[in-house]
Regions:
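Non-catalytic terminal and connector segments of soluble metabolic enzymes
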Residues: 1-337
Length: 337
């Protein structure tokens, strides 16, 4: 069976309350599907209504989407693989599978409180995550999301949800977390949730060798000065991030997307750079504090789980290098459906 695309919609409540990591980790590990792309959305009332119309088999979900306030920030994950829609739907659950003990993601991350009166009307319904029931619903929803992705998605702004001034910072979830479908990428996001920052940008990508050279260019002189094999060490960093050493590439190959998957995240809030760096931990996992990303997920100075920008200036430099503002969400969907 050929690969197909499906999607999962992480609701505004789940996104705001830091449930994204747990949802993502369980969805990827249980399904074995590839995280193809993703995007943060602030959907309009029209987009929410159009999406609701694709969930005819889930009336509670359809009503929930219609009732969401416009511009409520949410996260869409696009998954790829054999029989993707059916696999994701069985793991996410639906309107009828929210009363169990963790069999589905809705059991764990959603809530349904029904009246004890005859008829059992829903008093409170928060699904946490929504997924189409089949391939046809998936294609219909993906087309709507792709068409709206420029105007209603991207790197958003959550400053109105904070009482203090805010800043944005960049995180890269490194390739060591994607060796096989696992809970690791979600675990990294889960540990960052303790910062209380808003997740306002999300983009899976493959770093090219040329991007790696520019991204890690500032450390080359330091490594060459301090280590006899400094340039070789620098090339190893790029090979880890992009899949190939610069010296192994012809000039024309350097700009091609690399073989190693990464996910770029943008967090926003007061003192975002410092808070994320604290949650990240020391570059050397052996020296990192307990409960940090690098202590939990790192093994060496290079293979250490994640990268985070160390200054506002580097946030701008690094997001520019990896072209985070470019919208490949719609092109990946167009190529896959």
């Amino acid at each position: 069976m050929a690969d197909q695309l499906t999607y999962a919609f992480i609701t505004p409540t789940a996104l705001r309350k830091g449930r994204t990591g747990g949802i993502l980790g369980r969805l990827i590990s249980r399904s074995g599907l590839e995280l193809n792309t993703g995007r943060v959305f602030a959907p309009s009332s029209k987009l929410l209504g159009d999406l609701a119309a694709t969930f005819q088999s889930q009336p509670k979900t359809a009503a929930y989407l219609k009732a969401l306030p416009a511009d409520s920030q949410s996260l869409v994950l696009v998954l790829k693989g054999e029989d993707a829609a059916a696999k994701a739907a069985s793991i996410v659950g639906d309107d009828a599978s929210m009363g169990g003990r963790g069999e589905t993601l809705r059991d764990t991350f959603g809530d349904l409180v029904e009246s004890t009166q005859e008829g059992g009307q829903a008093v409170y319904f928060e699904p946490g995550i929504i997924a189409p029931a089949n391939a046809a619903e998936a294609v219909a929803g993906l087309k709507l999301l792709a068409a709206a992705s420029d105007a209603e998605g991207g790197i958003l702004d959550a400053s109105a949800t904070f009482t203090e001034s805010t800043e944005k910072t960049l995180v890269l979830i490194k390739p060591d977390n994607f060796a096989f479908p696992s809970t690791r990428p979600g675990g990294v996001i889960d540990l960052f949730a303790r910062t209380g920052l808003a997740l306002v940008g999300f983009k899976p990508f493959h770093m090219s060798v040329a991007q790696g050279e520019e991204f890690y260019g500032p450390v080359l002189d330091f490594l060459v000065e301090k280590l006899p094999d400094g340039r070789s060490q620098w090339e190893s960093i790029i090979a880890f991030m992009a899949g190939k050493r610069p010296s192994e590439c012809a000039a024309g190959e350097k700009n091609a997307p690399g073989s190693q998957p990464c996910v770029a995240l943008i967090y926003q809030g007061p003192d975002a750079v410092a808070k994320i760096r604290e949650a990240l931990g020391s570059t050397n996992p052996a020296n990192a504090a307990h409960g940090t990303i690098r202590k939990e997920f790192g093994t060496t100075i290079m293979i250490n789980g994640a990268h985070a920008s160390d200054s506002i200036e580097n946030v701008a430099r690094e997001t520019g290098i990896i072209r985070l503002q470019e919208n490949d969400f719609k092109t990946k969907i167009a190529a896959g459906i």
